[in-house]
Amino acid sequence: MKTKEVTPRGDSGEKLARDLLRLVPPQTHKLGTFRASELGRDLRAIVANYAPKTISGHIQIFRDDFIAPPYRQPLYGEFLVHAKTFHPQEPRGTFVFAFSVGDGPECTSVDTIFSPVSLFRVCGLGADAAPHTHRISHIWYESESDFLNVAANVRELIENCSLHKFLSPVGPLVQNIQSTFLNKITTVVKGEVLSNRSPPENIKLVLPSDLFFDMDETCPYPPSGDPVKPRVCYYVCILYVMVNNIPSASLQFFRTGKGASDVVFFLRRYYSDAIANKITVLGDNLDINNLTLGAVCMLGYSSSQSTPGRGNLHFRSYSLPTVEVSDFVAQPGSWTLI
């Protein structure tokens, strides 16, 4: 025999009320999504209608700065360098490299930082390679001994074709706090190139134009039906060459949408004359220690839809033509032998 539980009259009334409420369409709320400020205002009004009356004032979680879309926080690096090794006129956005001598007794707490201009200076190239950079490098860094005091083995590393092993790309410069003896250098090691101030300011990547080329324009792809890549990558290449029978290093920056294997293949063709000249000059002295031709390293990327701009860096009566990339994102890689 089945028994039926008797439902109290109060519970029956509550059930009836719930069933009736389900038939009533839910209350709609108007939200302005055109601007972040309007969205925050409407959300505050809705929450205020349902919040307990004991809460006074606005709901702080829905402030305008909370509604505003965030930016991607870059990773900054700070370095303490000798003032004479980094010129005050080095522009914000110039890509810098940290030189490391290892963990031996010669290692100090003061860092050694190279910009493209100062690195060109210590590589020992002539004016034929990059006339504008050559001229400004001898003005900014008149005395080469300032670098040799903090990086005494640079010449030896170039001769042994191993300079790239001690160079680490540390990103574009965003701040240079100067003093009499030591400077504090801040760079974007990884991420969007933004200033370390509030609000953040976008900083362009700045490179000497006579040290830069577009690989895709120099050696374009054959026509194909492949889709256009959304990014182009920026690289630095160090080539170990012989200049007047003296070991030197050639420095070049370039951008391309090609893959890593295509980049290495093209560089071997692009520098074929310099490579052949080195082998000819060395002759019987060519061995495994100086057989390394060069190395290439990725620095970051930008949109393939953007085109690098042109600029000029003026110093006294001289100017340095530059290439500027407004949407550069720092993402340094490791060195790959050519």
From Swiss-Prot:
Protein's cellular compartments: Virion; Host nucleus
Record keyword Heme present: no
UniProt KW Phosphoprotein keyword: no
Listed InterPro entries: Herpes_1
Keyword terms: Capsid protein, Host nucleus, Virion
A GO CC term attached to the entry: viral capsid
Broad class of where this protein is predominantly found: virion
MF annotations from Gene Ontology: DNA binding
Superkingdom, natural source: Viruses
Pfam families assigned: Herpes_VP19C
A biological process term (GO) from this entry: viral capsid assembly
Task of the protein: Structural component of the T=16 icosahedral capsid. The capsid is composed of pentamers and hexamers of major capsid protein/MCP, which are linked together by heterotrimers called triplexes. These triplexes are formed by a single molecule of triplex protein 1/TRX1 and two copies of triplex protein 2/TRX2. Additionally, TRX1 is required for efficient transport of TRX2 to the nucleus, which is the site of capsid assembly.
Assembly information from the UniProt record: Interacts with TRX2, MCP and capsid vertex component 2/CVC2.
Similarity comment: family membership: Belongs to the herpesviridae TRX1 protein family.
Protein name per Swiss-Prot or TrEMBL: Triplex capsid protein 1
Lineage: Viruses, Duplodnaviria, Heunggongvirae, Peploviricota, Herviviricetes
